[in-house]
Design a protein with these regions (language model features):
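Intrinsic-disorder/low-complexity accessory segments
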Residues: 1-244
Length: 244
């Protein structure tokens, strides 16, 4: 069969920029291009009312977007943009800035590390790899976010065993790298841990969470490629745009 692309739309009238619902994943691909061109971007922290109807918390306001650029954004990514005749209230907005993203890459980098890079590339999000020595040497001061791709705890902490390969490829983050990550967070940075790397974050930083499947044999719990149900608080910034 033929898979049809999403069809975008332009609604409303006015010269106070455009409002973009945050529910579509492709929103972020389009916003990446807008930010790369130096546009100002804000996000609604509560429902914003327009003559075309209410838009839920998490919508993006693009005050500097021209009608021509809005049309391209709509057609290229299948998005619906609402033109505004007046700017949203300042207390209903938060400023969005392009984060400086680092992806941790160990000398035992697993396949998910490559998939993480691919996903960011698909959405036009710039990133740089950081290695053990980079983190230990203070390079995190150049970033806002560090992603720990899905990797086992020992692979991140210990890396390759001494003697198993040349010296420069041996070891992991160790205590020095863990301390650098903790200082990074304490200074306002974000660490995002995916899947198995969450175990590293929990044990290293003493987080008040527990992996309930840790230590459970695969014959007792096996969940490959499954769809599970989540309860999401769509009023929280991490849940903006999600169904409740």
């Amino acid at each position: 069969g033929v898979v049809s692309s999403a069809i975008g739309a332009m609604k409303g009238a006015g010269s106070a920029g455009y409002l973009l619902d945050g529910a579509s994943n492709w929103v972020y691909r389009g916003l990446g291009e807008y930010l790369a061109q130096g546009g100002d971007l804000f996000r609604g922290t509560r429902t914003i009312s327009t003559p075309e109807g209410d838009v839920a918390a998490g919508a993006f306001w693009l005050p500097g977007l021209s009608e021509q650029a809005a049309g391209r954004l709509s057609s290229d990514f299948g998005l619906t943009l609402t033109a505004l005749s007046a700017a949203p209230a300042p207390d209903a907005l938060s400023v969005v800035r392009t984060p400086r993203v680092a992806i941790y890459r160990s000398w035992r980098a697993p396949m998910p590390e490559g998939w993480t890079r691919w996903v960011l590339d698909e959405y036009g999000i710039a990133w740089q790899n950081v290695w053990d020595a980079d983190i230990q040497g203070g390079a995190l001061s150049e970033f806002d976010v560090v992603i720990l791709p899905a990797q086992g705890e020992s692979g991140i902490r210990d890396g390759n065993d001494a003697g198993s390969m040349p010296k420069q490829f041996v070891g992991g983050l160790g205590a020095e790298g863990a301390a650098a990550l903790q200082s990074f967070v304490e200074d306002g940075g974000w660490v995002v841990a995916f899947d198995a790397s969450v175990d590293y974050a929990i044990s290293t930083f003493g987080l008040p969470f527990r992996n309930r499947t840790r230590g459970v044999a695969s014959q007792d719990f096996f969940l490959p490629g499954s769809i599970i149900r989540l309860e999401v608080d769509a009023t929280h910034p991490l849940g903006y745009g999600m169904d409740t």
